[in-house]
Amino acid sequence: MGTLSCDSTPRLATAPLGRRVTEGQIPETGLRKSCGTATLENGSGPGLYVLPSTVGFINHDCTRVASPAYSLVRRPSEAPPQDTSPGPIYFLDPKVTRFGRSCTPAYSMQGRAKSRGPEVTPGPGAYSPEKVPPVRHRTPPAFTLGCRLPLKPLDTSAPAPNAYTMPPLWGSQIFTKPSSPSYTVVGRTPPARPPQDPAEIPGPGQYDSPDANTYRQRLPAFTMLGRPRAPRPLEETPGPGAHCPEQVTVNKARAPAFSMGIRHSKRASTMAATTPSRPAGHRLPGRCC
């Protein structure tokens, strides 16, 4: 049964989560009710659950949208004195605008130039217009014979045609030009002469040729057996009574058998084989020292 209390501090009961208890209700689960205040039943708090974080990429909850993450950077260091700017120390002409210089027109007074003397020009009587052929009329062709030109000395600096040494085109001499066909005449080959002694010519049996089965497909080989022996005469063949099948124990289980050896003398010594060195303190069995 539940217990009633008039404590002003609300307490959580052990009723199922999600049920709200009002004033005047007393459940049978051990609920503690405050006087005049409704409380929730006892249950686990928010800090009991360990849910994956939604911030960042490490151990991030893949079923949720990632929350915004920010990084705090340390304060940048102050710039050294040599990197500081000079500040507003530049002089800008106020008359210079983005359209050009804006100022009133100014004029300059120069000195008087030197006077030039009268030029020497021909007068009207120096011309003869009647001697000038009409410019607008067609005139017949006119030719002029000049004097004989002086003969130029012979230029001997240029080489003669036979002074050039061009590479021949016979054979593959110049790789950029097609070569002319060239032929080579070889001398007559001497006839083959037999050796002085015909016995010095090696015969077919003197060549050491490997077995053809080592580097080619093996040839079929056959073996001929010898003549079989004549069967044993009937009088030498053992009969059924010559065999003793009851004495054969190879294919049967048999009792263990032991052999008794001879008695050895106690004074007789046996040759012991070479044994590895034994550690210190090790004693042979049967000996006291």
Swiss-Prot record:
<comment type="similarity">
    <text>Belongs to the CIMAP family.</text>
</comment>
<dbReference type="InterPro" id="IPR010736">
    <property type="entry name" value="SHIPPO-rpt"/>
</dbReference>
<feature type="region of interest" description="Disordered">
    <location>
        <begin position="108"/>
        <end position="136"/>
    </location>
</feature>
<dbReference type="GO" id="GO:0005881">
    <property type="term" value="C:cytoplasmic microtubule"/>
</dbReference>
<keyword id="KW-0677">Repeat</keyword>
<dbReference type="InterPro" id="IPR051291">
    <property type="entry name" value="CIMAP"/>
</dbReference>
<protein>
    <recommendedName>
        <fullName>Protein CIMAP1D</fullName>
    </recommendedName>
</protein>
<dbReference type="GO" id="GO:0005856">
    <property type="term" value="C:cytoskeleton"/>
</dbReference>
<feature type="region of interest" description="Disordered">
    <location>
        <begin position="265"/>
        <end position="289"/>
    </location>
</feature>
<feature type="repeat" description="STPGR 2">
    <location>
        <begin position="202"/>
        <end position="227"/>
    </location>
</feature>
<feature type="repeat" description="STPGR 1">
    <location>
        <begin position="122"/>
        <end position="148"/>
    </location>
</feature>
<dbReference type="Pfam" id="PF07004">
    <property type="entry name" value="SHIPPO-rpt"/>
</dbReference>
<feature type="region of interest" description="Disordered">
    <location>
        <begin position="181"/>
        <end position="211"/>
    </location>
</feature>
<feature type="repeat" description="STPGR 3">
    <location>
        <begin position="238"/>
        <end position="263"/>
    </location>
</feature>
<feature type="compositionally biased region" description="Basic residues">
    <location>
        <begin position="280"/>
        <end position="289"/>
    </location>
</feature>
